[in-house]
């Protein structure tokens, strides 16, 4: 499966309510992760509505950083994390969940399924997929 297919599938999982944003990104890469699907869902469960219930980082971005850490065996993960953050911000307009959802402004920057899609695409770009 190529990164565009992974991104489309992850966005669909989020759009249909099958996963939260972090879980959808983790699930999109489950074939590359040495972790059982049930465990992946548990790892991502705390990031529904981003970290801290919309107060901090988008769950999709968190999921992408978790995947990066595993697939690179932790080598270069801080650099990759920074690149992911920059790439995601360029695509979505922010990295904080409440800003992306437009909680304070009433003007969402990027809907959740698109944040998920963009996180997967950003990860693919940073990892060279």
Where are these regions (language model features)?
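Amphipathic alpha-helical segments within well-ordered protein domains
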Residues: 11, 26-30, 44, 48, ...
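Phosphate-handling active-site elements
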Residues: 31-42, 69-83
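Acidic-glycine-rich active-site phosphate/pyrophosphate-binding loop
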Residues: 2, 26-45, 89-97
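Structural signal for hydrophobic packing residues in well-ordered secondary-structure cores
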Residues: 14, 18, 29, 33, ...
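Polybasic, low-complexity association/targeting segments
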Residues: 1-14
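C-terminal binding/interaction regions
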Residues: 2-3, 82-129
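Glycine/serine-rich anion-binding loops at beta->alpha junctions
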Residues: 47-70
């Amino acid at each position: 499966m190529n990164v565009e297919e992974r991104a489309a599938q992850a966005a669909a999982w989020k759009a249909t309510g099958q996963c939260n944003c972090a879980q959808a990104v983790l699930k999109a890469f489950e074939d590359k992760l040495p972790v059982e699907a049930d465990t992946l869902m548990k790892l991502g469960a705390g990031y529904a509505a981003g970290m801290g219930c919309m107060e901090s980082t988008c769950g999709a971005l968190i999921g992408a950083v978790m995947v990066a850490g595993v697939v690179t065996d932790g080598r270069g993960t801080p650099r990759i994390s920074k690149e992911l953050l920059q790439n995601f911000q360029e695509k979505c307009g922010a990295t904080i969940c409440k800003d992306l959802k437009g909680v304070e402004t009433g003007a969402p920057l990027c809907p959740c399924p698109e944040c998920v899609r963009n996180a997967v695409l950003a990860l693919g770009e940073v990892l060279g997929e």
